[in-house]
């Protein structure tokens, strides 16, 4: 998303101004300020006021069909944007209603340029979205995770057949502002799988951190000391896993000196069927993700 010319402007409309949307807006403004123009909606007037205070230079609308959101010209550098990405950042149950609003907008105002519609909802398929949105819509399903809040997210994406290479690139650039790892997935079901792995994985990590901290405290460490040691250890291990080209099993083996305390700890996890429990948890999550689109 270069910023050298007005033709490179990307327009972003956020339907919903919740936590994920705010994280992405913050990242976009910091990373691409001169080459992105952003509008955002919210349902409640109080939320609209909060967003307007937080983002005084952005267009903030109550509801999804306001003329100021769709009928006002995109004005940054005085040119029509090269790409328009509409990000649907609402709860899954609200997605069909949002798409109905978008159909209304399309019939009354049209779109220039034709937008790419992006969702962040597991379970809701491109076929469903294509049925709800204007005919021939370009749709990208995505699954970011909560570390986008510190711009360290991981995001899986799946594009329908209508999405062009230019549209896919514009969407990837938007997520890259908050997500160093961007992965386009070839099979759509992979998005629901990614939601169960990368989407949920922060909770797995936080739970393990909490257990380790509690164990340290129970054996006499001060809570702040245990917390600092465990969190930094997790950060360091993640960085090592990213930078070291060897397998994860090799990295585990490095820590597990034969006959040592860590090896004994890993043996205890195996006795408790740790791997099987985690795999079963992933299955539960995956079943729930797939069911969302059927509710």
Swiss-Prot record:
Gene3D superfamilies, A to Z: NAD(P)-binding Rossmann-like Domain (3.40.50.720), ProC C-terminal domain-like (1.10.3730.10)
One annotated GO molecular function: pyrroline-5-carboxylate reductase activity
Top-rank EC class of the record's enzyme: oxidoreductase
Superkingdom of origin: Eukaryota
Phenotype upon loss of function: Decreases 100-fold the apicidin F production. Leads to the incorporation of proline instead of D-pipecolic acid resulting in the production of apicidin J.
Alphabetized UniProt keyword annotations: Oxidoreductase
Protein EC: 1.5.1.-
Induction: Expression is positively regulated by the apicidin F cluster-specific transcription factor apf2 that binds to the eight-base-pair motif 5'-TGACGTGA-3' called the 'Api-box' that is found in all promoters of the apicidin F cluster except in the promoter region of apf2 itself.
GO biological process: L-proline biosynthetic process
Biotechnological and industrial applications of this entry: Apicidin F, like the other known apicidins, is a cyclic tetrapeptides with anti-malarial properties via histone deacetylase inhibitory activity.
Pathway(s) per entry: Secondary metabolite biosynthesis
Family assignment from sequence similarity: Belongs to the pyrroline-5-carboxylate reductase family.
Described purpose of this protein according to its UniProt entry: Delta-1-pyrroline-5-carboxylate reductase; part of the gene cluster that mediates the biosynthesis of the cyclic tetrapeptide apicidin F (APF). The non-ribosomal peptide synthetase apf1 incorporates four different amino acids to produce apicidin F: L-phenylalanine, D-pipecolic acid (D-pip), N-methoxy-L-tryptophan and L-2-aminooctanedioic acid. L-Phenylalanine is the only proteinogenic amino acid directly used by apf1. The 3 other apf1 substrates are non-proteinogenic and have to be modified by other enzymes of the cluster.
Protein's recorded name: Delta-1-pyrroline-5-carboxylate reductase apf3
